[in-house]
């Protein structure tokens, strides 16, 4: 790296430190949802195997979790594997499931989870996942179920439309069984039929890779979420990029439809 490159790194670090102090002056979002997009495109651009791009994406999740805790952002939800991802090649899907499984095993061994009391939960149709992954998820959720300082949610086998449709089916079954009166269903009761009825709506939804859509992510919950789109691919998403997203959120006036 030349002198100009080193100076650029120094300037970037100074800017990051200044922005961190500025962000800490104002209220941060309680819940951030992140669409972790761009692993494969990043891999193609830098000339590495696509699977290695996914590994770097997994590692980035751990970094961003640290940044959230540094800013005392209590809840973060990562869009890790969508229902649409099942359409990828069987080899890639199998690799991703094993990578996700390894990530949960790492979390179970990670002292940060226990020190910071991080509750880890999966939202999605877990019945679509292989048995070994379902078992690892079950162990992770059971191990962290009493932790409440921070919440890390992973949307796996998740689709927003499917979540709403599944909720409607469950309501219909309960109505037929006489457990509920359909006329009494309101937004709060409907929420109880979602994958996690206790999950607060995200204040901010952030997407990497330059795509400007939410791609079936938390459709019910994101009605009034602020949106932020970053041009960088997920594996190269930096702390400075994250701070810019939070700073942008802080500059907005949320109206909640009013």
Curated annotation (Swiss-Prot):
**Enzyme Commission code:** 2.5.1.89
Where is Mg(2+) annotated to bind? Answer: 37, 226
Which spans are transmembrane here? Answer: none
Query: What keywords were assigned to this record?
Result: Magnesium, Metal-binding, Transferase
Single GO MF descriptor = magnesium ion binding
Q: Give the family from UniProt.
A: Belongs to the UPP synthase family.
Name of the protein in question: Tritrans,polycis-undecaprenyl-diphosphate synthase (geranylgeranyl-diphosphate specific)
Q: What does this protein do?
A: Catalyzes the sequential condensation of isopentenyl diphosphate (IPP) with geranylgeranyl diphosphate (GGPP) to yield (2Z,6Z,10Z,14Z,18Z,22Z,26Z,30E,34E,38E)-undecaprenyl diphosphate (tritrans,heptacis-UPP). It is probably the precursor of glycosyl carrier lipids.
Q: In the UniProt entry, which residues are flagged as the active site?
A: 37, 85 (proton acceptor)
Query: Which reactions appear under catalytic activity for this entry?
Result: geranylgeranyl diphosphate + 7 isopentenyl diphosphate = tri-trans,hepta-cis-undecaprenyl diphosphate + 7 diphosphate
Domain of life of the native organism: Archaea
- InterPro entries in the cross-refs: UPP_synth-like, UPP_synth-like_CS, UPP_synth-like_sf
- The gene from which this protein is expressed is uppS
**Which HAMAP family is this protein grouped with?**
ISPT (MF_01139)
Q: Which PANTHER family match?
A: DEHYDRODOLICHYL DIPHOSPHATE SYNTHASE COMPLEX SUBUNIT DHDDS, DEHYDRODOLICHYL DIPHOSPHATE SYNTHASE FAMILY MEMBER
């Amino acid at each position: 790296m030349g002198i100009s490159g080193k100076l650029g790194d120094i300037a970037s670090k100074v800017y990051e430190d200044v922005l961190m102090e500025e962000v800490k002056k104002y209220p941060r979002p309680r819940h951030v949802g992140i669409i972790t997009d761009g692993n494969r495109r990043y891999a193609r651009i830098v000339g590495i195997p696509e699977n290695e791009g996914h590994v770097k994406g997994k590692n980035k999740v751990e970094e961003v979790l640290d940044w959230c805790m540094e800013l005392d952002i209590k809840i973060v939800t990562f869009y890790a594997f969508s229902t649409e991802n099942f359409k990828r090649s069987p080899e890639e899907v199998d690799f991703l499931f094993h990578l996700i499984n390894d990530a949960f095993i790492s979390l179970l061994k990670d002292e940060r989870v226990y020190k910071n009391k991080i509750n880890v939960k999966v939202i999605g149709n877990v019945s679509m996942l292989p048995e070994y992954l379902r078992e690892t998820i079950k162990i992770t959720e059971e191990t962290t179920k009493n932790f409440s300082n921070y919440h890390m949610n992973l949307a796996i086998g998740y689709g927003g439309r499917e979540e709403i449709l599944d909720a409607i089916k469950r309501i219909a079954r309960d109505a037929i069984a006489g457990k509920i009166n359909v006329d009494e269903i309101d937004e709060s009761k409907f929420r109880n039929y979602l994958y996690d009825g206790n999950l607060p709506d995200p204040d901010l939804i952030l997407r990497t890779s330059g795509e400007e859509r939410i791609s079936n992510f938390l459709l019910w919950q994101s009605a009034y979420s602020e949106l932020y789109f970053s041009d960088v691919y997920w594996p190269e998403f930096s702390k400075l990029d994250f701070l810019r997203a939070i700073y942008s959120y802080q500059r907005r006036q949320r109206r909640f439809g009013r």
